[in-house]
Amino acid sequence: HTDVNNLINSLSKPRTILLMVPSGKATKDVIEKIKDLLDEGDLVIDGGNSFYLDSEENGLALEQKKIKFMGMGVSGGEEGARNGPAIMVGYKNKISEDLKNTLSAISAKTDQDCIGFYEGYGSGHFIKMVHNGIEYAEMQLIAEIYEILRRSKKTNEEIANFFDNLKEENRSSYLIEITSKILRQKKDEVYVLDEIKPFASNKGTGKLTVETSLNLKVPTPSIYAAYDARVQSNNKNDWEEINIESEVTSEIDLSNCLYFGRVASMIQGLELIAKHMVNIDFGIVLNNWMGGCIIRSNLLKELNVVSSASKDFLGDLKL
């Protein structure tokens, strides 16, 4: 279909419309364009990377016309598209079993479906936003470990071996595993990584996580530092003048720094979720992220064990 009217009219009622368009104005424009073409009881699912407050606003706008809405966060990238992503669903109206089954079938699989259902139009996108903030933090931790090893004159192969060894220690993650592959990638016998300028842009979710944490008065220093590092990387005058060699005294210390830095980042993200979503079941969130998504790792399994056995999950993690 090339005409929206024809597309809407071709669907059987009650209609289900899944939007996968850029967040912000584009999503709002599409919803505004189709809402008068829809009928009471139809459902709009926003599967984009929308800010959670936008999802709440869009849901309320459609609610006035008695049209249902779900804000659905999706994580997984290209691999998720092929093998199933982690899906974070925010809802207010009751979800039919058929739709639950369809979304669950699409989602990534571990020993269960990597999908979570959270009450509130913006809740699914809130969980996805925090996921992205944690992702920023872990990527920055990996970058800083790389920086230390590089300045201690380790080769790309040696650094890749360091990250590979974390898998044997059950301290690896999807991001760590692909870092090893990136470090070894060559083109015309030259390491690709060595040809890349150290600039890092962002899509806005890291910034939104930081702003939300400030608004909710929840400290997220690891996530903030990661976002700040991206901003600073675009200031050419800063990074060009830095040229300091270092010496690694213990790779065990670096392994511990990376591991506990990741634990701290995860705790910060979960505390932000807890502040916004009272009585949240962390087991659902951790299982939701266990497969398909960018931050999947053994750490999530470890935290899930603690969560299932603890009455004060976050408190116990801080001990």
Region roles according to the model:
Residues L272-K275:
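Long, amphipathic alpha-helical stalk/connector segments used for oligomerization, subunit docking
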Residues E135, S255-V263, N288-C293:
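Short, surface-exposed loop/turn motifs that are enriched in glycine and acidic residues
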Residues E56, D194-A200, S308-D312, D316:
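Metal- and O2-centered redox machinery and metal/ROS homeostasis
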Residues Y191-V263:
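A conserved active-site cap/scaffold subdomain adjacent to cofactor or substrate pockets
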Residues H1-L38, E57-I67:
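Conserved N-terminal Rossmann-fold NAD(P) cofactor-binding segment
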Residues N165-L166, N170, M277-A309:
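Small-residue-rich helix-loop
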Residues E158-N165, I223-D228, F282-I284:
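Beta-strand segments within the central parallel beta-sheet cores of soluble alpha/beta enzyme folds
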Residues T27-I31, L43-I45, F51-A160, E169-E195, ...:
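Rossmann-fold dinucleotide-binding core
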